A protein has these predicted regions:
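Bacterial N-terminal signal peptides that target proteins for export
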Residues: 1-10
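Bacterial N-terminal signal peptides
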Residues: 9-19
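Flexible loop/hinge segments at secondary-structure junctions
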Residues: 25-336
Length: 336
């Protein structure tokens, strides 16, 4: 779990940013992504307003810890009397916190399940509002020295799943099973992943494992960065994590939906078009009664998120910013 407290006074914000371990682990090549992807020039610059104070608490996805922290730091520059607390326990914790009234925002790296929505609606009489905050690609990573050229989702399923709902005839346990030769032929595949509280785990289970079950041999890691670190230190390793966590020590393997489909690289263009099989929206859920006015504190935080500055924070964290038309639609969901 990661918990971050930011009181929006300059000295304390600076201290919080310097001491935040997740930010320190973020790969340096996010800067390279900034050079190839630009924030939409049509996004509005954030304009602060008077009368904003109080406390914000975010509970949910650890994948979005860095982004939430960057937003909090940017927000801090405008509102010195606002306190922000960020807890990254996994996407599964977001719905319960919103239902229990213990959080302002519920960041999730997957959509809420029907059961979670139903539980929320049972208490409040309306559904939670999901707001897209950025675009991510869930990459399948191998060690940088691994010669594998591409994988189909059926192969990914046969590597990670014991149920093989993707239709593979047999499980894949060595790199030779994927056609690699020489020293790789008999090398066992070493699996890295997340635990069941993670939205990344849930998304991968649904979309790459065809809702099947993970093998018991998957080494469950405490965070997205840890998965990449595990693969980076294991020449036979393979794991899944957000594209924002890519480092120079791993490769994101190009993927195809099936054996008849085009192999798609993990590039920004393929994320925006939706061609990449594991592209996903990063979501922020809020408790907002339709037709009502959202409170000033959450209103302004959401406006900051969807501003030019807020989407630059998304880009800095290694994800892809929203086009202005999409950002505008997100604010309309809460009457803004």
């Amino acid at each position: 779990m990661t918990t971050t407290f930011l009181r929006c006074a300059a000295t304390l914000v600076a201290g919080a940013a310097l001491s935040l371990p997740v930010l320190a682990q973020k790969p340096a090549d996010a800067t390279a992504k900034e050079a190839s992807v630009k924030v939409d020039a049509n996004l509005p610059a954030y304009a602060p307003t008077a009368g904003v104070s109080g406390s914000i608490k975010s509970v949910g996805s650890d994948t979005m810890n860095n982004t939430m922290t960057l937003w909090a730091e940017g927000f801090a520059k405008h509102y010195p009397n606002v306190k922000v607390e960020i807890e990254g326990k996994g996407s599964a914790t977001a719905p319960a916190a919103l239902i229990g009234g213990t959080s302002s925002f519920g960041p999730m790296s997957r959509p809420m399940k029907e059961s979670e929505i139903d539980e929320f609606e049972k208490k409040f009489g309306y559904k939670p509002t999901g707001i897209a905050a950025g675009i991510d690609m869930l990459a399948v990573y191998v060690h940088k020295d691994n010669p594998i050229q591409s994988l189909t989702l059926q192969q990914v399923d046969a590597i990670f799943s014991k149920t093989r709902k993707g239709g593979a005839d047999k499980e894949i346990v060595t790199w030779g099973d994927l056609g690699l030769t020489g020293e790789w032929a008999n090398r066992p595949i070493s699996l890295y992943g997340r635990n069941s509280a993670s939205g990344t785990y849930g998304y991968f289970k649904e979309h790459a494992l065809f809702k099947g079950d993970f093998k018991d041999s998957v080494k469950e890691q405490p965070g997205s960065s840890a998965v990449v670190q595990g693969v980076a230190g294991d020449v036979a390793g393979i794991g899944y994590s957000g594209i924002g966590y890519k480092t120079a020590d791993v490769r994101a393997v190009p993927l195809a939906k099936d054996g008849k489909s085009k192999v798609i690289d993990a590039t920004p263009e393929n994320a925006y078009t939706g061609e990449y099989p594991l592209a996903r929206q990063l979501l922020i859920y809020v408790n907002h009664k339709p037709g009502s006015a959202i409170d000033p504190l959450r209103r302004e935080f959401l406006r900051y998120m969807m501003s030019k500055e807020g989407q630059l924070d998304v880009l800095k964290d290694g994800y892809y910013p929203l086009p202005s038309r999409m950002a505008k639609k997100q604010l309309e969901k809460v009457g803004l």
